[in-house]
Amino acid sequence: DNVSKIAIISDIHGNMPALEAVFDDIRKNDIDKIICLGDLVGKGPSCKRVIDFCRYKCDVVVTGNWDKFLSHKMEERNRWYLDRIGEERLQYLRELPESVGFYLSGRFIRLFHAHSEDVYLRMYPNLEIEEKLKMFNIPKISRLDNEERKSDIVGYGDIHGAFIDYLEDGKILFNVGSVGCPYDNIPMASYVILEGEYGMKEQS
C-alpha cells in the first residue's frame, strides 16, 4: 500500500497550545508528511516558539502575509514581535517560498497561503466562480515546484475558515482553516489530511 497521509496546517499566529494540540492529533493519525501554509507569527504571544517548532517539525513551510509583512517591513509598531522573534528567525521567514506543488494519485495539487497571484490577496468562499478559478492558474508567486501547469486541486489558508468547493472539470478548492485563530465560530483548531499516492502522476 503506497498511500501517504499528508497533514496541512495554517495560520498558527503564535498560538503554541493550539499548535501542540494539533500535533498531538497528527501523531495519532500516522501522518507521513506535514506542510504548513504560513502565518506562523502575529496576533499570539509565542511567535518565536511557533517558528522553531514548525521549522523542525514540518516538511515544508510556505510564507503567509503576516510572516512576509513582519520580516520585510520591520516597522516600529511591530517592535514587540520583532524583538522576540530575533533577526535569525526573521531571515528564515524572508527566505520561505510562497507555494508548493506535487502530484497525489494523478491529481496535481498546489498549496499556498492566500492566493496564486499575491500573498496579500484574499479569496473568500462567496466570491464569483471566475475569481475562484484564478486560484488554479500557474502561480505568479514563488514556488518550490517546476510544474508549468494549472492545478487540479488547490488548498490555502489565510481566511481562518475551512471550506471545500467542487468546481468545473473536477477542480477542488479547499481552505484548511486556522490552527491558532479560527474565525468560523468554532473555537477549535482545524487542519486537513490528504490521502493518496504521493508523487504519482497517473490516476489511481
Residue ranges and their predicted role:
Residues 1, 56, 146-150:
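Flexible, charged surface loops at secondary-structure boundaries
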Residues 4-94:
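Core catalytic region of metal-dependent phosphoesterases/phosphodiesterases
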Residues 5-13, 108-115, 173-177:
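Active-site-proximal beta-strand elements of phosphoester/diester hydrolases
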Residues 6, 33, 60, 109-110, ...:
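Structural motif
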Residues 13-18, 42-45, 66-72, 117-119, ...:
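Active-site environment of divalent metal-dependent phosphoester hydrolases
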Residues 29-30, 88-164:
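His/acidic metal-ligating clusters that form di-metal
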Residues 53-54, 102, 164-169:
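Short loop/helix-cap segments at secondary-structure boundaries that form the rim of catalytic
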Residues 165-204:
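Acidic, His/Gly-rich catalytic cores of divalent-metal-dependent hydrolytic chemistry
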